[in-house]
Structures are given as C-alpha cells and as structure tokens.
UniProtKB/Swiss-Prot annotation:
GO molecular function terms attached to this record: GTP binding; GTPase activity; translation elongation factor activity
Region named G5: 174-176
Annotated organism of origin: Azobacteroides pseudotrichonymphae genomovar. CFP2
Positions of the UniProt region annotated as G3: 81-84
Upper taxonomic lineage: Bacteria, Pseudomonadati, Bacteroidota, Bacteroidia, Bacteroidales
Protein name: Elongation factor Tu
UniProt-annotated stretches for the region G1: 19-26
UniProt family annotation: Belongs to the TRAFAC class translation factor GTPase superfamily. Classic translation factor GTPase family. EF-Tu/EF-1A subfamily.
Length: 395
C-alpha cells in the first residue's frame, strides 16, 4: 500500500507520555499507534522501536527521545516518549520537545510514585497547559476500591500542582491489552484519544503570534541601505511594515522594512520559519547587531531579570566537574546572543550539582528581548554547561 502523505490540514499538536519508570509509558505509546493504525491513522510502532530511542543533541545536550506521529479524526499529533527518567527531566526543562499537553501514565498496581509527582511538577513549571491521566494495568487489579483510591490520589496530586484535578479525564485501561488487540482495551485507547482531542487545547500557531526575528547577521548594500538577516521566529512581516529594533543598546529604534528577501528573491512577506533578509530604512549598519531582535513596534520589551527552570549538565555530558554556588556568573545564550548574567539560587539551596534541575533567578548585565517559555543555553568559556527556559519575567 502506498504511503500516504500526512494530512497537514488538520491542526498539529505536540504531546508526550510522562510518568514513573515501568508504569507503561512506552507500551501505551505502542498501543496508541497499533489501535489508530487499524483506522488508517497511524503506522504501527513496536515497543522495541520506541524504546530504542535515538540520541539527539539539542543545544549541546544529548537526550534520548522517540518521536512517533499519528492522527485522530480531527488532529495530527507528534508524540514524544523518553526511555529514562533523566531524559524526561532534560527534555521538559530544556524544551527540546515542546509539549502542548501530556499523558501522565500511572500504574493502578502502584498508584502515584515519586517520578509521577516529579513529572507533574515539571509539567507545571514549564507551563504544559493540560494533562490527561491514563491509569494503566487495571486488568491485573482485582479490588475496585484500589482503582478508586489511585484515582483520588491522582486528582489530589493534579490539584496540588494547579492542574484541574476535578475535571481532568482519567481513563482506566491496559496498554498491553490495547497493544495486543484485545477489543475491550482497544476501546479504552480510543477513549483516551477522544479525551486528548477534547481536553488538550490547540496551541496558537507561530504564524498567528506577533512578528519577531532575532538578528543573525547585518550587512550594508551600497545605495540601498542596511540588511538584517535571520530566521523569523513568529508572525509575519511585510514590505512597508514599521518595525522596532530591540535589545543591547538599540533603545527601541524604529524603522520601516523596504524589502523582504529570501534566496535573493524579493517577497511580499516573510513568515514564521523563513530565513530572510530585511532591508531597513534609515538604519546605519552599526545600529543593528547580532543578538538584537526586530519586531513590530511596542510588542516586545527588553528585560534584565527573569526566573527560569534549568538543567545543569553532568560531567559525563561535557558539563562542569564541580557544583556552582549563589552569584555564579556564566553566559546565557539566548536566541543569537551570548550575554553574561548572575544566578541567584532559591532560598535554602547552597549549591547546584552537575545533573541537577533547579529554579533560578537570572540578572542579565544588559537588557535582552525575552518572554516566558523562551529557551536558552548556559555556557562557560564557549561550552554548554546547562539549558533551560524562562518561566517568569521579573523586570
């Protein structure tokens, strides 16, 4: 049978399976592909194919992640599953696999365990909007009261981390049964997919957000003016648009785009994902620098103080060999810019060990255009020692 091209007209959503080790995350991922494949909405992926997740390098950090994709009647999903707990922490904190929602898998035989709690906390800290619970292995629990108890504990845990514990769907099923084609458990997998379709919100597409392009390079064309190049992160820009240059010492200088070029062709507009050159009226070459951002006027502010969730690399990952203490001053690589900043640790935290994840406050030495959810790397002498994302703007 010919391979069909994935239908891109359906809205695209990124999700993942999270939860404690051996509770059935990977088996559930395999079961979803098996059940949807019968409806022609997925390709079957076996447990082993998913479990042997390839290594990926994301901002200098190696993470094992398996990616599968499938569709429901209304949506197209990209689904991530990680083999090890450390991979989850790295993935969620660095935003390597951005999640619009997640399936938290909990075994009915155990109930919530330490990593169940830790993954829900991480989901909260990196602003995953909603979770759906899949209570797995219910086929090997004889006592219905046990199932009620696990459900109650999960709802309390969700409430504690400010997910809607009362209304979050909890589906009781058997991932193994679903993967093996037992109709009773296959129906539960479909019930789970319906819950995901209805409970997890559609993300706002990058193109619908306001225009922002980090500057990568700048050059001048004699007789025409200054061109700033970069990859448009969000939104659209058209010839004739008024724009503002932000960050470093730009002081919010305004200009007008007199041309949008891509591969030496003149375009009417550039949109999210395009690598373009913007011809800027009335701007000298030395007024725009790599690391600044170009936006529509008054949409983005430069900031110097933010809160962030970070993962610090282990020695084996090429990170630091020693812990760092309060007031540590590394470089933060934000978009296209390296900027020095000072780290303040949370109260009661003396130091941070390689391999830890921690919430920190960062004070940058000069203002940088940034926003919640923005990812960055932490560097020291040109090598990556950590990564994270901004969770709150302070000033």
């Amino acid at each position: 049978m010919a391979k069909e091209k994935f239908n891109r007209s359906k809205p695209h959503v990124n999700i993942g399976t999270i939860g404690h080790v051996d509770h059935g995350k990977t088996t559930l991922t395999a079961a979803i592909t098996a059940v949807l494949a019968k409806k022609g909405l997925s390709e079957v992926k076996s447990f082993d194919q998913i479990d042997n997740a390839p290594e990926e390098k994301e901002r200098g950090i190696t993470i094992n992640t398996a990616h599968v994709e499938y569709e429901t009647e209304t949506r197209h999903y990209a689904h991530v599953d990680c083999p090890g707990h450390a991979d989850y922490v790295k993935n969620m904190v660095t935003g390597a696999a951005q999640m619009d929602g997640a399936i938290i898998v909990v075994a009915a035989t155990d109930g919530p365990m330490p990593q169940t709690r830790e993954h829900i906390l991480l989901a909260r800290q990196v602003n995953v909007p909603k979770l759906v619970v899949f209570m797995n292995k219910v086929d090997i629990v004889d006592d219905p009261e046990m199932l009620e108890l696990v459900e109650m504990e999960m709802r309390e845990l969700l409430d504690f981390y400010q997910f809607d514990g009362t209304n979050t769907p909890i589906i009781r099923g058997s991932a193994l049964g679903g993967a093996n084609g037992d109709p009773k458990w296959e129906a539960k997998i479909m019930e789970l997919m319906d819950a995901i379709d209805n409970w997890i919100p559609l993300p706002q597409r990058d193109i619908d957000k306001s225009f922002l392009m980090p500057v990568e390079d700048v050059f001048s064309i004699t007789g025409r003016g200054t061109v700033a190049t970069g990859r448009i992160e969000t939104g659209l820009v058209r010839t004739g648009d008024e724009v503002q240059i932000i960050g470093l010492d730009a002081n919010g200088k305004k200009s007008v785009v007199t041309g949008v070029e891509m591969f030496r062709k003149i375009l009417d507009e550039g949109q999210a994902g395009d690598n373009v050159g913007l011809l800027l009226r009335g701007v000298d070459k030395d007024e725009v620098k790599r690391g600044m951002v170009i936006t529509h006027p008054n949409k983005v502010k430069p900031h110097t103080k933010v809160k962030a969730e970070v993962y610090i690399l282990k020695k084996e990952e090429g990170g630091r060999h020693t812990p760092f203490h309060n007031k540590y001053r590394p470089q933060f690589y934000v978009r296209t810019l390296d900027v020095t900043g000072e780290i303040t640790l949370p109260e009661g935290t003396e130091m941070v060990m390689p391999g830890d994840n921690v919430t920190i406050t960062i004070e940058l030495i000069y203002p940088v255009a940034c926003n919640e959810g923005l990812r960055f790397a932490i560097r020291e002498g040109g090598r990556t020692v950590g990564a994270g994302q901004i969770t709150e703007i302070i000033e």
